[in-house]
Amino acid sequence: MKNIETILKLAEEKIVLVHNLKDLQEYKVEFLGRNGIVTSELKKLGSLINGQKRKEFGLKINTLKDKIHDIIKAKAQNLEAEELHLKLAADKIDLTIPARRYKQGSIHPITQCMDELIQVFSQFGFTIENGPNIENDFYNFTALNFEYDHPARQMHDTFYLKGHENDKPLLLRTHTSTVQIRAMKNGKPPFRFIAPGRTYRSDSDMTHTPMFHQIEGLVIDKNINMGHLKYVIITFIRSFFENSNIELRFRPSFFPFTEPSAEVDIRMNKNDKWLEVLGCGMVHPNVLKNIDINRSEYQGFAFGLGVERFAMLKYNIKDLRRFFEGDIRWLKHYNFESFDIPNLAGGLTK
């Protein structure tokens, strides 16, 4: 495990020598990006068994991220000031010309929410897996234990495409569970990963859109049980919303690919209404059988959530359709800046 002081010193030494914003952005990615040095250290939290050590290490990494973020932001301000000074010195200034407003873009709320969700799961040691948006019937339905007459297979629920792959109909994936099947077929257990991405269903109203974003998670290992699932979900929810007082309840439900299955409801305060936020359960033995994993040796749990749903709850957005209208004024209202690095490690220690 890299020494935290060494990482901070390295960041300071590199950033102080930067002479332009392009190089500064590259160092930002190198240290604070999804695959950056600090993020890689943060992922090691999941391997720490001792709760106290995990708490201490999480706080240290959190402090390190804040310091590097402040160094980068201060350097960016200095570079911008230097560039302006050089430009003013080189140009002939007409003081009668009205000043132009400085326009700055902002991060879309879905992107911001996705980054925050991934950040939380990285603290559990989850890796990220990706897969194609166009799938065949096997990966989207059959391998996940959907019966051939299941309603989700019907054309009014699923976008089918022309053509076949290995004699299987092609379609736009209806969930990112397809990534789980591909990842397990191409690897060997144990597994612990999330699959973020776009999904597609033939539905459009105030609470549904034909394209939406999901994050689905999977853990496969020996001696996995429902207690592990509940711990991950409860800790994740309270960390993401940065509220240790959130109440959760697990309601029995049904999903073809999990057994037992549950839907998770939350409420921020005791007098609030319960809100459904995600589905989860223990991986169905038939799913493991379909990809040749020994069901008597390995067990696992899976969960899936809608990113738009979590963004609406956290940022108090009432209408799902606003995410996709492209209204610059609406996007500017939330004003997530490119230097707003998700910083939620402290949520695990509340």
From Swiss-Prot:
Q: Where are the transmembrane segments?
A: none
EC number assigned by the record? 6.1.1.20
Cellular location(s): Cytoplasm
Positions the record marks as coiled coil are: none
Q: Name one GO molecular function term.
A: magnesium ion binding
Q: Tell me the InterPro entries matching this sequence.
A: aa-tRNA-synth_II (IPR006195), aa-tRNA-synth_II/BPL/LPL (IPR045864), Phe-tRNA-synth_IIc_asu (IPR004529), Phe-tRNA_ligase_II_N (IPR004188), Phe_tRNA_ligase_alpha1_bac (IPR022911), Phenylalanyl-tRNA_Synthase (IPR002319), tRNA-bd_arm (IPR010978)
**Which terms under GO biological process does the entry name?**
phenylalanyl-tRNA aminoacylation
Q: Please give an example of a GO cellular component term from this record.
A: cytoplasm
Which top EC class is named for this enzyme in its record? Answer: ligase
| Keywords from the named record | Aminoacyl-tRNA synthetase, ATP-binding, Cytoplasm, Ligase, Magnesium, Metal-binding, Nucleotide-binding, Protein biosynthesis
This protein's cofactor list reads: Mg(2+)
Q: What chemistry does it catalyse, as a reaction equation?
A: tRNA(Phe) + L-phenylalanine + ATP = L-phenylalanyl-tRNA(Phe) + AMP + diphosphate + H(+)
Outline the subunit composition: Tetramer of two alpha and two beta subunits.
Similarity comment text for this entry: Belongs to the class-II aminoacyl-tRNA synthetase family. Phe-tRNA synthetase alpha subunit type 1 subfamily.
Q: What is this protein called?
A: Phenylalanine--tRNA ligase alpha subunit
From which source organism is this entry? Rickettsia prowazekii (strain Madrid E)
> What is the phylogenetic placement of the source species in the record?
Bacteria, Pseudomonadati, Pseudomonadota, Alphaproteobacteria, Rickettsiales
